[in-house]
């Protein structure tokens, strides 16, 4: 058994990528909120007038901004999937070199082939893709923006009141109350999708590059150890479903982590690490 997880560097890199994605996506929406704040400064907070032309123009501009954010998010997540996959493969190369196998090469074609299983949705055996999911999240946000404006006009709210509600909606630090009829945080769907894609890219690359290694006998499920670990992940770490030990799964039976997951995995092998490096 190896003393240390040979894929620890890739695991740490995955965390860096997820954190970077989170900051970037959140900034997209903060920048949009700043634009609305500028608009609010031009409005009379004491006026009860509802300017439909102004509100429809504001709605149009925000919807265009959401399209831009969608494109940017798609690029960020795609890049995160690719680089995380490559890091796993590089760790595997180091691992194989350490046990005497030097013919393993990490080519751009190999990285793309593995990453595409996640990006195109082949991993999920359904009519799904990263692009369609991100655009779907963007459309839901646009629907919410349109709903805020339409409901405000219907309820005879002032232009300022409606714009203020839009400001609250696009503020990633604010969660609108349930009675508003709109679910927040506004960036939640994009954040959840981004984290899930990188996590699944990490897991898929980990399995693909080790499943045919005869020295790797099984996989071990390891939770993040954080306070918010869900019951399902705790069960996966503690259960001995296959009689191999707690949290240990045959190579063809490692469960795919759930959306927004943060668990990791280790290889199980009887290979003597000390002998390998002293040979």
In which residue ranges do the predicted regions lie?
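N-terminal leader/targeting and assembly helices and adjacent pre-domain segments
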Residues: 1-178, 271-279
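Acidic, glycine-rich two-metal-ion catalytic cores of nucleic acid-processing enzymes
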Residues: 181-279
